[in-house]
Protein backbone atom coordinates (compact mmCIF):
# COMPACT_ATOMS: atom_id res chain seq x y z
CA UNK A 1 0.00 0.00 0.00
CA UNK A 2 1.35 3.45 -0.77
CA UNK A 3 2.14 6.07 1.86
CA UNK A 4 -1.01 8.17 1.80
CA UNK A 5 -3.46 5.34 0.98
CA UNK A 6 -5.14 7.53 -1.65
CA UNK A 7 -4.74 4.86 -4.31
CA UNK A 8 -5.17 1.27 -3.20
CA UNK A 9 -3.02 -1.43 -4.71
CA UNK A 10 -4.91 -3.43 -7.31
CA UNK A 11 -2.82 -6.51 -8.04
CA UNK A 12 -4.05 -9.49 -6.09
CA UNK A 13 -7.46 -8.12 -5.04
CA UNK A 14 -8.85 -11.52 -5.83
CA UNK A 15 -7.50 -14.39 -7.84
CA UNK A 16 -9.00 -16.87 -10.27
CA UNK A 17 -9.59 -20.48 -9.24
CA UNK A 18 -9.18 -22.79 -12.25
CA UNK A 19 -10.93 -26.14 -11.99
CA UNK A 20 -8.55 -27.95 -14.35
CA UNK A 21 -5.60 -28.14 -11.92
CA UNK A 22 -5.10 -29.56 -8.42
CA UNK A 23 -7.16 -27.61 -5.88
CA UNK A 24 -4.13 -26.83 -3.70
CA UNK A 25 -2.53 -25.19 -6.77
CA UNK A 26 -5.74 -23.42 -7.79
CA UNK A 27 -6.03 -21.82 -4.34
CA UNK A 28 -2.68 -20.03 -4.71
CA UNK A 29 -3.18 -16.42 -5.93
CA UNK A 30 -2.17 -15.91 -9.55
CA UNK A 31 0.86 -13.64 -9.99
CA UNK A 32 0.22 -10.45 -11.97
CA UNK A 33 -3.43 -11.20 -12.64
CA UNK A 34 -6.56 -9.56 -11.36
CA UNK A 35 -10.20 -10.51 -11.06
CA UNK A 36 -12.01 -7.17 -10.73
CA UNK A 37 -15.34 -6.31 -12.34
CA UNK A 38 -17.04 -3.20 -13.74
CA UNK A 39 -18.50 -2.36 -10.34
CA UNK A 40 -15.00 -2.40 -8.80
CA UNK A 41 -13.59 0.32 -11.11
CA UNK A 42 -12.93 3.54 -9.18
CA UNK A 43 -13.03 6.71 -11.27
CA UNK A 44 -9.88 8.88 -10.91
CA UNK A 45 -7.92 5.94 -9.45
CA UNK A 46 -4.28 6.11 -10.59
CA UNK A 47 -1.36 3.71 -10.67
CA UNK A 48 2.27 4.37 -11.62
CA UNK A 49 4.62 1.83 -13.13
CA UNK A 50 8.20 1.05 -12.40
CA UNK A 51 10.72 2.85 -14.63
CA UNK A 52 12.32 1.11 -17.59
CA UNK A 53 15.36 2.06 -19.66
CA UNK A 54 15.15 1.25 -23.37
CA UNK A 55 18.41 -0.20 -24.71
CA UNK A 56 19.85 -0.09 -28.22
CA UNK A 57 19.67 -3.87 -28.65
CA UNK A 58 16.01 -4.20 -27.77
CA UNK A 59 15.13 -1.17 -29.90
CA UNK A 60 16.70 -2.84 -32.96
CA UNK A 61 15.07 -6.16 -32.08
CA UNK A 62 11.66 -4.44 -31.91
CA UNK A 63 12.32 -2.62 -35.22
CA UNK A 64 13.21 -5.91 -36.90
CA UNK A 65 10.22 -7.70 -35.46
CA UNK A 66 7.72 -5.11 -36.73
CA UNK A 67 9.74 -4.30 -39.89
CA UNK A 68 10.19 -0.64 -38.97
CA UNK A 69 13.54 0.34 -40.47
CA UNK A 70 12.88 4.05 -40.85
CA UNK A 71 16.25 5.86 -40.86
CA UNK A 72 15.39 7.72 -37.65
CA UNK A 73 15.11 4.44 -35.73
CA UNK A 74 17.41 2.11 -37.65
CA UNK A 75 20.26 4.10 -39.21
CA UNK A 76 22.81 5.54 -36.79
CA UNK A 77 24.65 7.49 -39.52
CA UNK A 78 21.51 9.11 -40.89
CA UNK A 79 20.23 9.99 -37.42
CA UNK A 80 23.55 11.60 -36.39
CA UNK A 81 24.42 13.35 -39.65
CA UNK A 82 21.10 14.20 -41.31
CA UNK A 83 18.41 13.71 -38.70
CA UNK A 84 16.58 16.48 -36.91
CA UNK A 85 17.51 15.19 -33.43
CA UNK A 86 21.14 14.15 -34.18
CA UNK A 87 20.57 10.76 -32.54
CA UNK A 88 18.39 7.70 -33.06
CA UNK A 89 14.80 7.58 -31.91
CA UNK A 90 12.95 4.70 -30.34
CA UNK A 91 10.02 3.73 -32.59
CA UNK A 92 6.73 5.24 -31.45
CA UNK A 93 5.09 1.81 -31.64
CA UNK A 94 7.69 0.55 -29.16
CA UNK A 95 7.10 3.44 -26.75
CA UNK A 96 3.35 2.74 -26.98
CA UNK A 97 3.82 -0.99 -26.43
CA UNK A 98 6.30 -0.66 -23.57
CA UNK A 99 4.46 2.22 -21.95
CA UNK A 100 1.16 0.38 -21.77
CA UNK A 101 2.85 -2.90 -20.92
CA UNK A 102 4.41 -1.30 -17.85
CA UNK A 103 0.95 -0.91 -16.28
CA UNK A 104 -0.83 -3.91 -17.81
CA UNK A 105 -2.94 -5.57 -15.14
CA UNK A 106 -4.01 -8.79 -16.88
CA UNK A 107 -7.56 -8.60 -15.58
CA UNK A 108 -9.43 -11.75 -16.59
CA UNK A 109 -12.75 -9.85 -16.82
CA UNK A 110 -11.56 -7.00 -19.05
CA UNK A 111 -11.12 -6.97 -22.82
CA UNK A 112 -9.61 -4.32 -25.07
CA UNK A 113 -12.25 -2.39 -27.02
CA UNK A 114 -9.87 0.04 -28.71
CA UNK A 115 -7.65 3.10 -28.33
CA UNK A 116 -8.43 6.79 -28.80
CA UNK A 117 -6.38 9.99 -28.86
CA UNK A 118 -2.97 8.35 -29.33
CA UNK A 119 -0.34 11.09 -29.48
CA UNK A 120 3.45 10.90 -29.66
CA UNK A 121 4.19 14.16 -27.88
CA UNK A 122 7.99 14.17 -27.65
CA UNK A 123 10.73 11.91 -28.98
CA UNK A 124 12.18 9.03 -26.98
CA UNK A 125 15.81 8.17 -27.62
CA UNK A 126 17.81 5.02 -27.09
CA UNK A 127 18.93 5.00 -23.47
CA UNK A 128 15.92 6.99 -22.20
CA UNK A 129 14.08 5.71 -19.15
CA UNK A 130 10.27 5.72 -19.27
CA UNK A 131 7.43 5.16 -16.81
CA UNK A 132 3.64 5.29 -17.10
CA UNK A 133 0.71 6.66 -15.11
CA UNK A 134 -2.68 5.07 -15.74
CA UNK A 135 -5.93 6.75 -14.64
CA UNK A 136 -9.51 5.45 -14.73
CA UNK A 137 -11.42 8.28 -16.42
CA UNK A 138 -15.02 7.13 -16.83
CA UNK A 139 -17.28 4.13 -17.08
CA UNK A 140 -20.70 3.53 -18.56
CA UNK A 141 -22.96 0.53 -19.04
CA UNK A 142 -22.79 -0.63 -22.66
CA UNK A 143 -23.93 -4.23 -23.18
CA UNK A 144 -26.01 -6.81 -21.38
CA UNK A 145 -23.00 -8.47 -19.73
CA UNK A 146 -20.36 -5.72 -19.72
CA UNK A 147 -19.75 -2.00 -19.57
CA UNK A 148 -17.08 0.27 -21.04
CA UNK A 149 -14.26 1.81 -19.02
CA UNK A 150 -12.08 4.62 -20.41
CA UNK A 151 -8.54 4.74 -19.05
CA UNK A 152 -5.81 7.28 -19.83
CA UNK A 153 -2.14 6.40 -20.19
CA UNK A 154 0.57 9.02 -19.88
CA UNK A 155 4.09 7.84 -20.64
CA UNK A 156 6.92 9.98 -19.25
CA UNK A 157 10.68 9.97 -19.65
CA UNK A 158 13.42 11.20 -17.38
CA UNK A 159 12.19 13.41 -14.58
CA UNK A 160 8.59 13.71 -15.77
CA UNK A 161 8.61 14.87 -19.39
CA UNK A 162 5.47 13.50 -21.09
CA UNK A 163 6.21 11.66 -24.33
CA UNK A 164 2.98 9.77 -25.13
CA UNK A 165 -0.71 10.01 -24.32
CA UNK A 166 -3.59 7.74 -25.23
CA UNK A 167 -6.95 6.56 -23.96
CA UNK A 168 -7.88 2.89 -23.80
CA UNK A 169 -11.44 1.62 -23.90
CA UNK A 170 -12.00 -1.67 -22.07
CA UNK A 171 -15.13 -3.75 -22.06
CA UNK A 172 -15.43 -5.09 -18.50
CA UNK A 173 -17.77 -7.79 -17.23
CA UNK A 174 -20.41 -6.85 -14.67
CA UNK A 175 -20.31 -8.69 -11.38
CA UNK A 176 -24.12 -8.46 -11.27
CA UNK A 177 -25.48 -7.95 -14.81
CA UNK A 178 -29.05 -7.68 -13.50
CA UNK A 179 -28.13 -4.35 -11.86
CA UNK A 180 -27.56 -2.85 -15.33
CA UNK A 181 -30.45 -4.41 -17.27
CA UNK A 182 -32.17 -1.04 -17.83
CA UNK A 183 -28.97 0.95 -18.49
CA UNK A 184 -27.19 -0.73 -21.40
CA UNK A 185 -27.67 0.08 -25.09
CA UNK A 186 -30.32 -2.14 -26.65
CA UNK A 187 -30.03 -2.99 -30.33
What is each stretch, according to the model?
Residues 2-113, 175-187:
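Hot-dog-fold acyl-thioester-processing enzymes
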Residues 3-7, 151-174:
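Short peripheral tails and domain-boundary helices/loops at the edges of structured domains
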Residues 36, 42-49, 129-131, 148-150, ...:
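Intrinsic-disorder/low-complexity, polar/charged segments enriched in Ser/Thr/Lys/Arg/Asp/Glu/Gln
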Residues 55, 138-139, 170-172:
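A short acidic/small-residue loop/turn micro-motif
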Residues 62, 71, 79-82, 110, ...:
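Hydrophobic small-molecule pocket/channel-lining residues, especially in calycin-type beta-barrels
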Residues 114-158:
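Hydrophobic beta-sheet segments that form the core/acyl-binding groove
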Residues 117-122, 168-173, 180-184:
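A structural preference for long, well-packed, hydrophobic secondary-structure segments
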